[in-house]
Amino acid sequence: MRGLLGRSKLGADEGLLLKPGGSVHTFFMRFPIDVVFVDRDGQVTRVVRDLAPWRVAGSRRARAVLELPAGSCARVEIAPGTRLSFID
């Protein structure tokens, strides 16, 4: 899976949902991202803000990972305990 590799940026309202997933890396990425780890019930278990290129992050309880532009979690107030829902 390539994820965001090769992209130069994300739009302010764009993101990538990786499902299933419990960890991410930013090897070869060109920009920092916010990473939201979500459990099977849609509850946020961990938030990593401004994850720089060449880093790794994970959450054992996560079943999905949402990658967002850096600053998005602060802007829309996503924090551990927030419940998210996704529409397929």
Regions found by a protein language model. Name each.
Residues 1-88:
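Compact, glycine-rich, soluble single-domain proteins
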